Amino acid sequence: MAPREHPHPDLHEVELVTVLAALAEPTRLRIVRMLAAMEERERAWKDIDLPIARSTLSHHLKILRNAGLLWSRTEGTRCFVSLRDKEMEGRFPGLLECVLACQDSVDVPMAKGGVREDRAAS
Amino acid sequence: MAPREHPHPDLHEVELVTVLAALAEPTRLRIVRMLAAMEERERAWKDIDLPIARSTLSHHLKILRNAGLLWSRTEGTRCFVSLRDKEMEGRFPGLLECVLACQDSVDVPMAKGGVREDRAAS
DNA sequence: GTCGTACTTCGATATTCGTCGAACATCGAA
DNA sequence: TTCGATGTTCGACGAATATCGAAGTACGAC
């Protein structure tokens, strides 16, 4: 289907385990990190370049959306996603921040523009 | 088997996804919260009172241990577990703290002493 | 209207995970 | 040494999950 307007949960109704489960998957964590590392606050669905099928990507984005982690916006037949980091900070203070700050093996080698070199290098 | 000395991972080798996955399960999150809410820093294995089989509990404790979240110590035939919160703070600054601080539906109604009333009430 | 693009949903599959009871291993006590 | 207590491991099971390709749906362009 075309990107029909998706339901976005009220963050007050999102449970911590849901958020943790959403983040506890390498591909999804990578997506979150990529969105956080961008200069623009939005990323075009089409430009999310990962070695997975598009249907799988759609699946992961849905899980992140249901966990309150990202916002998707429709523009014609296209879709743009962005982190709900401000809201998440209100609901789970410090969580997203420390997840993003942490250094581990899940990197952000996602081409097609938007990756900040300065962050990637630190 | 009796509580043979278990392997505890070096926290530098523990990945964020491993920790998140360990925490992203209601029973395990409950165990972590219970350990954090205790006055004594240790809890006897035997006194962890949850509505699950003992083999299941053993399984969950192993996952938490492998994620670097808890430490288990053997004393004769008994076992005592405690949070590795200080070390986790060094590896993933702020993570455990904000997970414990967050308010959601996973409570800590675990009897047999050790639950702090002041925390439970806040 | 017809076609193509852009996502989403469906159905199928393989893997992982939570759970249990039973069997096992280790220690202390009798 | 025999017994009981204490955890752990094993084997099995159903449920959940990550993945894909194919089919479907909505929109813009022509």
Language-model segments: residues:
Chain A
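Amphipathic alpha-helical dimerization/coiled-coil segments
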Residues: M1-E15, R33-M38, R84-S122
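Generic macromolecular interface patches on structured domains
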Residues: R41-E42, A67, C98
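Canonical helix-turn-helix DNA-binding module
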Residues: W45-S72
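N-terminal helix-turn-helix DNA-binding core of bacterial DNA-binding proteins
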Residues: T18-A53, E75-E87
